[in-house]
Amino acid sequence: MATRRQFIKAGLVGGTYLFIPAGSASARAWPGVLDRVLDPTRIDKYVTELAVPPVMPWTERDEAGRVDHYTIGVRQLRQQILPAGMPTTTVWGYGSTRHPGSFSYPSCTVEATFGRAVRVTWVNQLIDRHGNHLPHLLPVDPTLHWANPQGGVSRRDTRPAFSSTPGPYTGPVPIVTHLHGGHNTQESDGYPEAWYLPRASDIPDGYARVGSFYERFKAIFENQFDSVWEPGAAVFQYANQERAATSWFHDHALGVTRLNVYAGLAGFYLLRGGPSDLPDGVLPGPAPKLGDPPGKHCYEIPVVIQDRSFSTDGSLFYPTSRASFDHFTGPYIPGSDISPIWNPEFFSNTMVTNGRTWPALSVEPRRYRLRFLNGCNARFLILKIVTDPMAPRPADPVLPFWQIGSEGGFLPAPVQRDQLLTAPAERADVVVDFTSIPVGTDLYLINEGPDEPFRGEERAQTSGQRHPEPLDRS
């Protein structure tokens, strides 16, 4: 029987360091904001347990039609992403509208079965308790080619014209959800132009409430299925006829995808069964299941790795000016066509795994199945398992990954890899065998991917670290 699992209660690795944010988000690239950006070296590492995303509750199961129904909303919530004792963070999360406790960042996992359809009513619930719309958590640049609700029906989904440099957009937030990796029909694909606003009571007159493809796809869906799209929502159906694989869902609204995902709108969608899947018992398990008791130990774990930055009050930090990228402070509009807020890329300074900064996973001397997702907006990851997170790069791995699958499902045969290279949105389905590691060994999942393509390098103390895996007795 396994002993009580403990976490590493280490503070800063390697002592005290000066604050040097990762990659292009360097100290000199954030003029005027360093006093409110949280120094990542002040965040204790490995004091928090790795969260395992639970399974999303369904609303109804139609056994005759072989359809699982879900009603999934998008809401604003506060969550402990930084370690206990530090401020909570306001984020957005998906969750079952019938289960208020299911809203989280990242989302609960949708478990799907080959040949059994999943129908989701996606509801935009970004409203306050009075029914008024919530503004975005992050700065929205209205000068891009984007959803542009304030442009009305005639100017939605365009790049609006301004006679002077505008401030950020603060109106109701458009959303639309895309199943990334799914074989989706057009009306259920989450087109960027099929967005919709929340059903708020204070949407200004003249605003477009839906994107230019919304009504078209609504008509197609309602004609094909007995399901109505209500205001502030869309209904999508996924046939689940493709190979068993690791997919994920995320927001996809035109011109704000980067912001909506950064705010928290992402979750796993795991398709099982069918001729391409493996028989039960071949791979490590169990995986999380609906109704699991708190603290249940699983041996198949979805793992999403994302980079984030925080303000000193715990809120998410995102650049408010183009100057954060290349020091360009204008002229913007009308002196040029350069957008004043948007950054071509942004590399944050803190690594977040399954919604927690630098967590620890306590493992037993056995095999684990880890389903990795690179959920970063711009960062490539090169993952290794090592015993010293501060070792000179390239570090020597102590354990290989046995990659068994990728975005499209299982590989023809397992591939032994000393490192995993993943681009944003890519998945890697791997087995890690801890049976040969002495009990009590501290292992670290590190990143050797650069903070910035071609010009930067990973920061060993911050963006170069993920989480450790201390070995327990069994």
Kindly give the residue locations of the regions a language model identified.
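Alpha-helical secondary-structure segments
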Residues: 245-258, 300-302, 366-371, 445
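N-terminal, post-signal-peptide metal-ligating segments of extracellular/periplasmic oxidoreductases
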Residues: 4, 9-178, 183-202, 215, ...
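A conserved hydrophobic secondary-structure block that centers on an alpha-helix together
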Residues: 222-256, 260
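Histidine- and aromatic-rich segments of cupredoxin/plastocyanin-like copper-binding domains
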Residues: 184-209, 309, 320-474
